[in-house]
Amino acid sequence: MPVRFEIGAPIVPNTIVYGGSAIRVGSANFTSGAVATNVADSSNVKKLLVTAGHYVSLKDKCYPIKGTRPDTDTLLGTVTKVQYADGKYGDYSLITLGSDIEITTNTYERPYELTPLVGGYYPKDGDTLYKFGRAGNVAKITFQEANMSVVMPASSSGSSTITIKGMMIGKIEDGISTGGDSGGPVYYNSSEGLKLVGFVSGTTSTGTNVYLTFTPVSRVTGCGINYVD
């Protein structure tokens, strides 16, 4: 089921959606990680938005954030898949966009110019990665480990925890990640151009060190990825 992932710039009012945009999903402020086109059935093409899955429920509505508040007059779409449960792999959700919502070409705002996204990438130990979030902007990360099990709050109240499997982790070297960055893209700046690695989940700390946890693209199941050169 091939899907084209794209990451980009802020939302243009009413019609166009990019990755890397500030969005409200249910009661959570997130960053969109990528837009995707499900082209498995040419007679029923679905436009999707990929973001984080924590604190999200099926059928939650998604709106763009304008300034500091959601624009509830502009419905982008509805959550149709959530992956965030104890013992499961990855932290993400898929939002099916309305038929009137347009998606963009294969570009990403980093953060002041549109740059092509040339494919996906599975990082090696020590690789320099970058995350983008609408709250914390760009942060530089040193990749450390894949296939991690991460303990996270079961709900926004934080009264209990669950374990999410199959996550990646990297040490934040420069910049920050904060509330509102969840779901945003993590990428690798290769000699060929930017390559998508995953989607922001959260942070954890050890002493003075802060680490970013993120869902690798390979954990977004049920879809193939078709990058546009």
How should each PLM-predicted stretch be described?
Residues M1, A52, T213-P216:
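Alpha-helix initiation/capping motif
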Residues M1-P13:
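Autoinhibitory propeptides
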Residues V17-T163, Y188-N189, S201, Y227:
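Serine endopeptidase catalytic core focused on the charge-relay Asp
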Residues K165, I169-S201:
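Glycine- and charge-enriched low-complexity intrinsically disordered segments
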Residues Y187-D229:
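C-terminal subregion of chymotrypsin/trypsin-like serine protease catalytic domains
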